[in-house]
């Protein structure tokens, strides 16, 4: 996250969500690497939430640990490791290996879905490299067979 230019106000993918005060207050209870489920008993009555919401998917990133698999949708993005807000589209994209200048299109919700549904670019690249090696090997085998004939 330290590679992101937070001063660039033109990057709409780095605009944080406008959370309600209650949501922000709930986020304050989540420890780094933890989730809301771990702190349910400590929430004041006015911050209590349904069991559906508290399944444990509202978790805070830990700067010293690997990020979890991100899933589609802004409400599924984890809480920022330090700030009391969900991570931005840009932060989610950087975590999954997108280049810093990658541009997402569509509504905020669609851009979140694009990141959450994407195969992480470094993984896609590694798969592509192996596919090329395999296909090159097939070509080499065909050449060897043709030369033997």
Label for each model-derived stretch:
Residues 1-149:
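C-terminal target-recognition/interaction regions appended to catalytic cores
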């Amino acid at each position: 996250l330290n590679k992101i230019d937070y001063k660039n106000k033109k990057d709409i993918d780095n605009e944080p969500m406008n959370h309600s005060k209650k949501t922000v207050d709930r986020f304050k209870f989540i420890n780094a690497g933890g989730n809301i489920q771990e702190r349910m008993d400590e929430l004041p009555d006015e911050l209590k939430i349904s069991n559906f919401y508290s399944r444990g998917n509202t978790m805070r990133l830990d700067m010293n640990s690997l990020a979890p698999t991100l899933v589609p949708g802004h409400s599924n993005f984890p809480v920022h490791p330090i700030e009391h807000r969900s991570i931005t589209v840009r932060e989610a994209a950087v975590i999954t290996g997108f280049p810093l200048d990658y541009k997402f299109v569509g509504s905020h919700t669609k851009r979140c879905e694009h990141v959450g549904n994407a195969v992480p670019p470094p993984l896609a690249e590694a798969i592509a490299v192996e596919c090329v090696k395999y296909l090159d090997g097939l070509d080499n085998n065909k050449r060897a067979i043709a030369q033997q004939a």
